[in-house]
Amino acid sequence: MFLGEYEHTVDEKGRLAIPAKFRAGLAEGLVLTRGFDQNLLLYPMPVWRELAARINALPITQPSARNLRRLMFAGASDLGLDKQGRIVLPPNLRQYATITNQAVVTGMDSFIEIWSAERWQTVLDSFADEAPALAEHVSAFGI
């Protein structure tokens, strides 16, 4: 389970430290890909395989299914942690997420999001305005 948020420096080689408490959940390998909100998504390999199977089950005749495949698979990278618990963020993914020297790693239970520090702050700032509507919306789900 991945929980919490952590700000880390991205070095000149694009290396980002993954929080120590997240590393055991990534021991079987991981996949990094584009997210839906100008962020990156980091999946443990078992979760990625399940997600990929579900995406591949979507009919290729639907434009939205093709676009989802492009978003999730075209930029994806199969990665591993180095001895210091870091991953290398590929240049194309750093550019997509506008990550330069600071990144925020956030736990999303079964996967991890990686944000530029600036973009994450914008997301946090938007919560103040959106929280009441979100609370009302999720109440329909018994949350």
Curated annotation (Swiss-Prot):
The keyword Transcription applies. Its main location: cytoplasm. Gene3D superfamilies: Transcriptional regulator MraZ domain (3.40.1550.20). Keywords: Cytoplasm, DNA-binding, Repeat, Transcription, Transcription regulation. Belongs to the MraZ family. Forms oligomers. This is Transcriptional regulator MraZ. The gene is mraZ.
